[in-house]
């Protein structure tokens, strides 16, 4: 077998009949499979041992040779080679066809490659191949030309003969008629009888004329067809063809079926054809030129690849190895077999019958029919159902052909090559493990024992608990006591991987150190649930065991959960306290006025109370019960750093040192909370709402090493659970309080609603206005009930505590429980003007319940659809970006993009940009950031973290130029500096990081949270697409629904207002041609934007617009933005539009992820004029390749090619990738492979997918070339030492090792039998 690590490209091409015969180990002559009595393969059949190898190791068919020592011998009785049975997985056979057949992929694909090559319409091609028409394969022009006059004379003679015969017959008939009439007249017959005779005579004469005319027409037809006869001409009329062959057989050859196609291809001159097509393209116009372009693609493919087009017509069909189309015996003596065997059987049967018919010399019509059936059976074998009705098996199920084995989710690519099942894995239900550290998980004992079995067995033998592996295995199976001790030892420091399906982003698989636990459930740390999206309502997780040292190192260093605290999408921590923990910390840090032991200042004769000399003293007081943790106290602190303001005031420039004392007015709870934070973190003296907790952890992640952050969140988790228990927050029916003012509020609004209803009945309002008014009224009512509810609830109400702390839920839910449900939507997404006035606490009426179900059901249906759609989007994103890998440190480009940091308010203050988190944060600065005085605040090449951004804002800088992947100059992949900081580590991205896949996951993972619906904006008007469909529309570069025109030029607007349409004309400032936008529907409203005078209003007559400005409401078409404003603008447009959808759902994704995808969409250039290059006009070329080729051509003094950037949707971009393996495993497998084979494509194996498919290490991380191809150089001392070793003769090593390949030596290939 090939070792995958020793080749670095993979080529696909057309196999000729010669290739097929060379691969083959013998011809399959019989359709038999196995003998049903002996169950041994039949000789020369589809499972024949002579061809494919023995069915049992080292045993021939007849049993003469058994044992390894006969290795390689071919038995003289049965002809079977003595070898391993596994050769039946790799040895191929073939079927010699009695007549050639065409390959259905090349004939039936769209476009038909055979049709383009031979310039035949697919319909005609089908007629020829399936024996419905003859085709002329060659004409002897010269001979025909030389003898034309002779032939014409012969033809004239023949026609003369026909005419003479006709005239003679007419003459005779006329005379007979005369005689008959004369006779009748003599007899004195009536006029009636005479007329009948005359009519009869004339009818016969007409028939004679017609017959002669038909004969003449036929001769004319034959002659004209013959004189115009040319190769590739179709003749559908069988009789005409027969006549031509009889008369002029020596001047031309013609045939039917694949043989004729084969002849045409043989006579086909590729170079001449390519030249003439190029000529047409240079000088032609319109349809002709287009057709020539399409044909040239196919012709040039054959010309450049050196493929022989003969490969499209097969003389022999390969038979794949039998183990890949097995036959298994079921219980009950029946057999189950692969569909391929059926398809092969049909081919062999028909082929054998055809051979017999040809040998018998059967009539042509029978032979042709058999050839047609053979062609159809080969078609079914290659791609069943591509043409006509598919061949069906039992139960009318279409049989799976060779193409179906590759296609789709169940095909070879996606089922076996890209996703495999692995051993050393298990799965179980998860339960919470609050006692675990962040990097630990609880593994059930039994599962651990099974997973680590080989390790345990080896260790048992090492420790002499067992004599050999076999007895060790027995000990493990019987679970002896020693086994558990050994298991503890083996499991230590050996991380395991936990995975929860669906794995939407890379944090869906993380490594943990296992702790053995009783029971059968896996225990999971509560803080990693967010990343896995896990909860404990019955979720299951899978465990995998990394075996090799490298795998363990990777798991420990890169995948350990404590190293994955930050989200790769936004760079913000994911391991945050949630739910109970938030409640506990919120409770702990609340200050309750007037609680036990509160600080009282000195008054009169009372000294001050509630003052403590240290936290320890306060804790003693709390333990005695004289102080509550939530009471305000004064305490002297020495180990906690004071807040920044206090530190500056008390300790001045020198700053606080551990041990310096200061007094804090706070609560004991807050002191306890601050003791959880790392030493030297400023004291936080406020109530810990979830947002505050998040901000603190965020800050820790920016300033402290990951390990500190991990320890801190663990401490917070423990304290959170402890105090959540102590707080006694529970929910009961008694906690849901209905506000007493609810009835009067609703009565008041009911009156207002009645007024509107009356106006409607009087006709003062139309239906829509009434609905809008009612919706407004009831929205106000709902809000007011909410207000009343809030005032009515006491602060210590548990429901309010849970909502206020940010643990879970929101106020709307509280309002629904205790206030009123409010307005609900109908299935169309519009508000129903009758509100639900009851709360869930009171219970709904039947009508309210009914209208409430609409929304609930729609929600569930949406969720199901969304999951599938979102998964498919992620798959396409991964596919388009999988080869974007960080390839170098810095591409040295000067380009970048400008991002806003802040906006200057009219009063001169800076308003921080709300999206700074996803735009400027974590980027590399492209130019020095300079303030107004000219001081450099942040230098070029600096990473912009939170401190740097704060410094820039403090210096009054509003925008900076940053490096971006959109402007990166690296040819394949991107460079680290343009990408900037890796969101997941908080440091500059490593070389070898697969940033494309991270980007795809970051965009796809929140996809399930996006909405499915298209919003109705304000009732009427075009629907604005939103949510997931909008993201797909953008990434697929489709023309959006409700497309808005954009200004092609800068100028003044003339707006003409028609009855149903607007007409907008722009008069350019530079005096160019006016641009007219006609028939713009009024349903699309005019766009509101800022005008030169600073006002915001609708576009109106006489306004001045900038180039690229949107004129109507709706979405601009990205292709137009590209045409009008160029690639830069369309990139920014796409990033902005995608972000808008995610921001609407409150999802934070960094711009750089979207930029990676957008970069892939704009990678290609379409060739307009090929100049002196080899590019074909209209083809899509990678920009880097285009520029390189142009440089080369210009250097040689040629004419460069002209191209135009194109925006491709992600599906199209994935299929247009240079890697045919990656494209084939994505979609349209047969089309991609057909194309790749014709072009003799090479896959350079640059991306990830290709390497996964062939089983190489992926070129990312340490698999990238600069890490893989490291040569170790010995030091001088080592060199000197090397020469002191006595040299051995080479032959010691040569027989077994030779030039080492670096591959492991498979021991079972060495026959040890000789030494026994």
From Swiss-Prot:
It comes from the Bacteria. Mg(2+) binds at residues 535, 537, 539. It is an enzyme of class 2 (transferase). Its EC number is 2.7.7.6. Pfam families: RNA_pol_Rpb1_1, RNA_pol_Rpb1_2, RNA_pol_Rpb1_3, RNA_pol_Rpb1_4, RNA_pol_Rpb1_5. Its cofactor is Mg(2+); Zn(2+). DNA-dependent RNA polymerase catalyzes the transcription of DNA into RNA using the four ribonucleoside triphosphates as substrates. InterPro entries: DNA-dir_RpoC_beta_prime, DNA-dir_RpoC_beta_prime_bact, RNA_pol_asu, RNA_pol_N, RNA_pol_Rpb1_1, RNA_pol_Rpb1_3, RNA_pol_Rpb1_3_sf, RNA_pol_Rpb1_4. GO terms for biological process: DNA-templated transcription. Keywords: DNA-directed RNA polymerase, Magnesium, Metal-binding, Nucleotidyltransferase, Transcription, Transferase, Zinc. It comes from Mycobacterium tuberculosis (strain ATCC 25618 / H37Rv). GO terms for cellular component: cytosol; DNA-directed RNA polymerase complex; peptidoglycan-based cell wall; plasma membrane. Induction: 6-fold repressed by starvation. One of its GO terms (molecular function) is zinc ion binding. This is DNA-directed RNA polymerase subunit beta'. Zn(2+) 2 binds at residues 891, 968, 975, 978. The keyword Zinc applies. CDD domains: RNAP_beta'_C, RNAP_beta'_N.
């Amino acid at each position: 077998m090939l070792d995958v690590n020793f080749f670095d490209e993979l080529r696909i091409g057309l196999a000729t009949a010669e290739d097929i015969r060379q691969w083959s180990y013998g011809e399959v002559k019989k359709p038999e499979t196995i003998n049903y009595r002996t169950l041994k393969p039949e000789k020369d059949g589809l499972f024949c041992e002579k061809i494919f190898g023995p069915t049992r190791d080292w045993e021939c068919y007849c049993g003469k040779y058994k044992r390894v020592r006969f290795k390689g011998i071919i038995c003289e009785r049965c002809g079977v080679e003595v070898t391993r049975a596994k050769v039946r997985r790799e040895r191929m056979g073939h079927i010699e066809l009695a007549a050639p057949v065409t390959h259905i992929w090349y004939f039936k694909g769209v476009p038909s490659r055979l049709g383009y090559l031979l310039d035949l319409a697919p319909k005609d091609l089908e007629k020829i191949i399936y024996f419905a028409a003859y085709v002329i394969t060659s004409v002897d022009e010269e001979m025909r030309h030389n003898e034309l006059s002779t032939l014409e004379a012969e033809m004239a003679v023949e026609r003369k003969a026909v005419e003479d015969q006709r005239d003679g017959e007419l003459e005779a008939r006329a005379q007979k008629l005369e005689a008959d009439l004369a006779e009748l007249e003599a007899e004195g017959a009536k006029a009636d009888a005479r007329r009948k005779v005359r009519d009869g005579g004339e009818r016969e004469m007409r028939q004679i004329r017609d017959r002669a005319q038909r004969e003449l027409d036929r001769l004319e037809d034959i002659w004209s067809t013959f004189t115009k006869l040319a190769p590739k001409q179709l003749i559908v009329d069988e009789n005409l063809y027969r006549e031509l062959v009889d008369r002029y057989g020596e001047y031309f050859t013609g045939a039917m079926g694949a043989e004729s196609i084969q002849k045409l291809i043989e006579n086909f001159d590729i170079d001449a054809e390519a030249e003439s097509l190029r000529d047409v393209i240079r000088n032609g116009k319109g349809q002709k030129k287009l057709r020539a372009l399409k044909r040239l693609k196919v012709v040039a493919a054959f010309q450049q690849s050196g493929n022989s087009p003969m490969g499209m017509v097969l003389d022999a069909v390969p038979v794949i190895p039998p183990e890949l189309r097995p036959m298994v015996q079921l219980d009950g003596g029946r057999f189950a077999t692969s569909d391929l065997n059926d398809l092969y059987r049909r081919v062999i049967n028909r082929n054998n019958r055809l051979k017999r018919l040809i040998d018998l010399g059967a009539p042509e019509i029978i032979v042709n029919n058999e050839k047609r059936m053979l062609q159809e059976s080969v078609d079914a074998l290659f791609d069943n159902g591509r043409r006509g009705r598919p061949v069906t098996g039992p139960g009318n199920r279409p049989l799976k052909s060779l193409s179906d084995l590759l296609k789709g989710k169940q095909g070879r690519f996606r089922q076996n090559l890209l996703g495999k099942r692995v051993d050393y894995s298990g799965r179980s239900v998860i339960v919470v493990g609050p006692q675990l550290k962040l990097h630990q998980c609880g593994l059930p004992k039994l599962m651990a024992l099974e997973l680590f079995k080989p390790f345990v067995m080896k260790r048992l033998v090492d420790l002499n608990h067992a004599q050999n592996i076999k007895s060790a295995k027995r000990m493990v199976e019987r679970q002896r006591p020693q086994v558990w001790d050994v298991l503890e030892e083996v499991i230590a420091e050996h991380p395991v991987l936990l995975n929860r399906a669906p794995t939407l982003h890379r944090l869906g698989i993380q490594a943990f150190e296992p702790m053995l636990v009783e029971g059968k459930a896996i225990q999971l740390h509560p803080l990693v649930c967010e990343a896995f999206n896990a909860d404990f309502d019955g979720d299951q997780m899978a465990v995998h065991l990394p075996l090799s040292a490298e795998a363990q190192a990777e798991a420990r260093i890169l995948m350990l959960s404590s190293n994955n605290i930050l989200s790769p999408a936004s760079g913000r921590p994911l391991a945050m306290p949630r739910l109970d923990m938030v409640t506990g910390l919120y409770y702990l840090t609340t200050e309750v006025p007037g609680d036990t032991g509160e600080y009282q200042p000195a008054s009169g004769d009372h000294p001050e109370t509630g003052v403590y000399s240290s936290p320890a003293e306060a804790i003693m007081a709390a333990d005695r019960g004289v102080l509550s943790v939530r009471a305000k106290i004064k305490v002297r602190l020495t180990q906690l750093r004071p807040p920044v303001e206090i530190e500056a005031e008390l300790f001045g420039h020198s700053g606080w040192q551990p041990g310096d004392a200061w007094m804090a007015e706070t609560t004991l709870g807050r002191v306890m909370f601050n003791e959880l934070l790392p030493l030297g973190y400023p004291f936080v003296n406020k109530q810990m709402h979830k947002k505050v907790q998040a901000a603190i952890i965020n800050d820790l992640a920016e300033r402290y090493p990951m390990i500190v952050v991990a320890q801190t969140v663990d401490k917070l988790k423990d304290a959170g659970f402890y105090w959540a228990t102590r707080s006694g927050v529970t929910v009961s029916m008694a906690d849901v309080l209905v506000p007493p003012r609810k009835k009067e509020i609703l009565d008041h609004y009911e009156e207002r609603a009645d007024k509107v209803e009356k106006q409607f009945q009087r006709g003062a309002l139309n239906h829509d206005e009434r609905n809008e008014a009612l919706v407004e009224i009831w929205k106000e009512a709902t809000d007011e009930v909410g207000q009343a509810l809030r005032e009515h609830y006491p602060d210590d109400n548990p429901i309010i505590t849970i909502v206020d702390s940010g643990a879970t839920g929101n106020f709307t839910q509280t309002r629904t429980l205790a206030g009123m449900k409010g307005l609900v939507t109908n299935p169309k997404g519009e508000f129903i003007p009758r509100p639900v006035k009851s709360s869930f606490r009171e219970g709904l009426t039947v009508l309210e319940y009914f209208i409430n179900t609409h929304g609930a059901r729609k929600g569930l249906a949406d969720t199901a659809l969304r999951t599938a759609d979102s998964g498919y989007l992620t798959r396409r994103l991964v596919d388009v970006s999988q080869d974007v890998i960080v390839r170098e440190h810095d591409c040295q480009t000067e380009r970048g993009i400008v991002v806003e940091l802040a906006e200057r308010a009219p009063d001169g203050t800076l308003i921080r940009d709300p999206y700074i988190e996803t735009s400027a944060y974590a980027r590399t600065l492209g130019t020095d950031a300079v303030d107004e005085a000219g001081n450099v605040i942040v230098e070029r090449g600096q990473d912009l973290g939170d401190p740097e951004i704060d410094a820039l804002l403090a210096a009054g800088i509003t925008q900076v130029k940053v490096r971006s992947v959109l402007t990166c100059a690296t040819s394949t992949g991107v460079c680290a500096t343009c990408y900037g900081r890796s969101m997941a580590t908080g440091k500059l991205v490593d070389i070898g990081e697969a940033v494309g896949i991270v980007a795809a996951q970051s965009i796809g993972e929140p996809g399930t949270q996006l909405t499915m619906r298209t919003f109705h904006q304000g009732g009427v008007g075009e629907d604005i697409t939103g949510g997931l469909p909008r993201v797909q529309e953008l990434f697929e570069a489709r023309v959006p629904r409700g497309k808005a025109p954009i200004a092609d030029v800068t100028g003044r607007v003339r707006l003409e207002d028609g009855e149903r349409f607007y007409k907008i004309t722009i008069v350019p400032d530079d005096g160019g041609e006016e641009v007219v936008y006609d028939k713009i529907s009024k349903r699309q409203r005019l766009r509101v934007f800022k005008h030169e005078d600073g006002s915001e209003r609708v576009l109106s007559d006489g306004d001045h617009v900038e180039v690229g400005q949107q004129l109507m409401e709706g979405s601009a078409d990205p292709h137009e933005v590209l045409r009008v404003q160029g690639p830069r603008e369309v990139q920014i447009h796409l990033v902005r539009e995608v972000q808008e959808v995610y921001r609407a759902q409150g999802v934070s994704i960094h711009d750089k992820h979207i930029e990676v995808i957008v970069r892939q969409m704009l990678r290609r250039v379409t060739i307009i004029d090929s100049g002196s290059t080899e590019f074909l006009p209209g083809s899509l070329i990678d920009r880097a390749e285009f520029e390189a080729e142009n440089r080369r051509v210009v250097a040689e003094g040629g004419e460069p090619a002209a191209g135009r950037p194109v925006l491709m949707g992600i599906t199209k971009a994935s299929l247009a990738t240079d890697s045919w393996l990656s494209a084939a495993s994505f979609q349209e497998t047969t089309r991609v492979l057909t194309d790749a084979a014709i072009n003799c494509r090479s896959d350079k194996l640059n991306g990830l997918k290709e390497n996964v498919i062939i089983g190489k290490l992926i070129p990312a991380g340490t698999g990238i070339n600069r890490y893989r191809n490291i040569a170790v150089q010995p030091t001088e001392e080592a060199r000197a030492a090397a020469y002191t070793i006595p040299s051995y003769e080479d032959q010691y090593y040569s027989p077994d090792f030779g030039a080492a390949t670096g591959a492991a030596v498979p021991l079972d290939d060495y026959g040890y039998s000789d030494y026994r």
